[in-house]
């Protein structure tokens, strides 16, 4: 009798999994219609079906939520670093202007052209330094964001999410961004309407609960 009950439960569980897969696939097919036609053509039925399978137990929603939170923290940190550098440059320029004004006021009139020429050379040197520091900061930001993208690609590939692998190809990156957007919108739909609206079971509640507490994830 126990064997029979276990077999029935296994069949019922399989049916529930099939239903969840169907609901996710239908939702994905509906969301894909909102994408540009060029990307719709690349998201075949097989790709969407594989994506729906990867989303079944809710783990991928958790992974995406975590990746986006890490990305946002990284972006905020890099933004603050650049802001600090800009403030340092602003203070440096103000101090240099003050120094030059005081020097001009203190010098004899016949020495003014010589002082001004020296000050112009100093100003050009400082502006060159500022440009170099800004360029280095921008390169650092680009490299750090590229590393984060590669980390996201690798993590989602290991999680079995269709369409994700490490690449720098612009078209593939755009496709992956669209796939992330589909996942995010599914998660938002779960936040707004609850699992019942999609016919999804318990495992998907955790990301929805996170949305209730922290707000919906923001696309990369």
Curated annotation (Swiss-Prot):
Keywords: Coiled coil, Nucleus, Phosphoprotein. It is found in: Nucleus. The gene is DGCR6L. It comes from the Eukaryota. Its main location: nucleus. This is Protein DGCR6L. The keyword Coiled coil applies. May play a role in neural crest cell migration into the third and fourth pharyngeal pouches. Pfam families: DGCR6. GO terms for cellular component: nucleus. Residues 76-159 form a coiled coil. Widely expressed in fetal and adult tissues. Highest expression in liver, heart and skeletal muscle. Lower levels in pancreas and placenta. Weak expression in brain. Belongs to the gonadal family.
